[in-house]
Amino acid sequence: APEVSFSRKMREDEAKSGIPASLLLQYGMMSLDYVLRVCPPGTRITLLTELDNRTDFWLRDLAYIILPNGECLNELLIRNGFAKASHSYHCIHLHYFQEICRLAQLEKQGIYQFSNIF
């Protein structure tokens, strides 16, 4: 999902996308708002990790977040246009996530209402 604070990664994202950091920050806040609506603080979640893909380039932990109703928060974020699937974050479901990401883009879901890239 987009970043919610100015950081080195946001400056990299700004350079790659051509979108000003201030706008990327707004997109990040939109994604955060969606997460808080779907999974408010205190929600019990289950984290599932892949042994071969536990961290990303920045050594952040990667996991599938399973909600109490069994839905995957990662999938919901992508399907609703508040996160994107990137080849930079390999996982066993990458192809599926890229497909639903493209659908969200075509259907102008979430952030895609404002920009085709983020």
Q: How does the language model describe each region?
A:
Residues 87-118:
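N-terminal targeting pre-sequences for secretion and organelle import
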Residues 1-82:
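Electropositive
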